[in-house]
Amino acid sequence: MEKTLSIIKPDAVERNLIGNIVKRFEDAGIKIVAMKLLKLSKAQAEAFYAVHKERPFYGELTDYMSSGPCVPMILEGEGVILKNREIMGATDPKEAAAGTIRADLAIDKEKNSVHGSDAPETAAQEIAFFFTEYELAG
């Protein structure tokens, strides 16, 4: 069964949207197999988003992602990577389809409420970043 990582970002946690977002995944038939609340340090945010290190938004992104608690989750289901990305909507909420998380809940392109892996390889890497094998056992 396919797995992906989704993160409820600090802006959504601060606005008490965890339940709203989780319900959207569950209503879509997606199983949440692991979930935790944590606060990334600046160094952890930089490591997680290292792929964007040369991009102009890297500093702001890592500052934002280390600004408050977030909720990484492992989602599981058939075609869950694509399904998750459809439920999240486009990165820029102005371009996101109506009814998606970002269209309904995001503040702006940076504070867009959720992150989702974009491919099986990145999903595996991102899951391993947040969850140990012990946490995934069972």
Swiss-Prot record:
Biological-process GO terms, alphabetical: CTP biosynthetic process; GTP biosynthetic process; UTP biosynthetic process
Catalytic residues (positions): 115
UniProt-listed SMART domains: NDK (SM00562)
InterPro entries on file: NDK-like_dom, NDK-like_dom_sf, Nucleoside_diP_kinase, Nucleoside_diP_kinase_AS
Recorded GO MF terms: ATP binding; metal ion binding; nucleoside diphosphate kinase activity
Named cofactor requirement(s): Mg(2+)
Reaction catalysed by this enzyme: a 2'-deoxyribonucleoside 5'-diphosphate + ATP = a 2'-deoxyribonucleoside 5'-triphosphate + ADP; a ribonucleoside 5'-diphosphate + ATP = a ribonucleoside 5'-triphosphate + ADP
Family listed: Belongs to the NDK family.
HAMAP family associated with the record: NDP_kinase (MF_00451)
Name listed for the protein in its UniProt record: Nucleoside diphosphate kinase
Species lineage: Bacteria, Pseudomonadati, Thermodesulfobacteriota, Desulfobacteria, Desulfobacterales
Encoding gene per record: ndk
